[in-house]
């Protein structure tokens, strides 16, 4: 296990790790297999590399636009970095691509806003999300803008990340240790279904350009969805 901030320093050295962590928190909730589909939302997120690759291939075959991986890199950016789907779901490789995209956005923003480091950084967040310096600042009724979400995540993701918890004495030294809960297996090894009428309660936030489908020919999988994006203080990447 590698703490996220350590991974970010190794794989995305040109971006402050706390900044990268804030983006990842909003984009994928630190899920390396996350897929966001433009115009829809997956019924649930893939829970394994094989399932993520199969889902991406299925979406591509059906002509969908989507972003993938821990930093939600858009599928059309993969050829630019010589990346396959399998590589894009590798946290380090995905962070490297995401950091390059953000760095390019920031370099262009600081030229337009000389001496305004934080202003340029926020403009770069918008660029990362929407492909321009304004789209990420737009809000929807009852929802903050993408840039506001990223900035708000900074306070959360900069807290210390605990890899191994502190040992605590139990009242009874002979207390039984709870057996680990056995995870349910995916209903099948096919692609995850896509919902063309997404609700606002599912899926991580994704960008429109670097952005989030139920395939009508299939039925939704019955497997429980993986945990959401509440992975903050104890974030680790396997």
Swiss-Prot record:
Gene3D superfamilies on file: 1.10.530.10
Going by the UniProt record, its keywords in alphabetical order are: Virulence
Looking at the record's lineage, which domain of life comes first?
Bacteria
**Keyword Kinase part of the UniProt annotation:** no
Q: Which Pfam families match?
A: SLT
Q: Where is this region: Disordered?
A: 197-238
KW Mitochondrion (keyword) present: no
Q: Which family does it belong to?
A: Belongs to the virb1 family.
**Protein's name in the database:** Type IV secretion system protein virB1
The lineage is: Bacteria, Pseudomonadati, Pseudomonadota, Alphaproteobacteria, Hyphomicrobiales
Query: What gene does this protein come from?
Result: virB1
């Amino acid at each position: 296990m590698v703490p996220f901030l350590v991974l970010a320093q190794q794989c995305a050295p040109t971006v402050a790790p706390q900044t990268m962590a804030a983006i990842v928190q909003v984009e994928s909730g630190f899920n390396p297999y996350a897929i966001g589909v433009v115009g829809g939302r997956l019924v649930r997120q893939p829970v394994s590399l094989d399932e993520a690759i199969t889902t991406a291939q299925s979406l591509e075959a059906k002509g969908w636009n989507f972003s993938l991986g821990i930093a939600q890199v858009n599928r059309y950016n993969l050829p630019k970095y010589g990346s396959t789907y399998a590589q894009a779901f590798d946290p380090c490789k995905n962070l490297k691509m995401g950091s390059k995209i953000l760095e390019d956005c920031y370099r262009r923003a600081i030229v337009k806003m000389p001496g305004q480091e934080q202003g340029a950084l926020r403009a770069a967040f918008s660029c990362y999300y929407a492909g321009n310096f304004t789209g990420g600042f737009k809000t929807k009724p009852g929802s903050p803008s993408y840039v506001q979400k990223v900035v708000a995540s900074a306070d959360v993701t900069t807290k210390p990340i605990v890899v191994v918890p502190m040992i605590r004495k139990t009242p009874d030294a002979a207390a039984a240790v709870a057996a680990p809960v056995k995870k349910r297996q995916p209903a099948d090894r096919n692609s995850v279904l896509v919902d063309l009428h997404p609700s606002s309660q599912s899926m991580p936030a994704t960008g429109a350009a670097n952005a989030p489908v139920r395939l009508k020919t299939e039925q939704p999988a019955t497997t429980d969805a993986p945990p959401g994006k509440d992975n903050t203080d104890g974030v680790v990447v396997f």
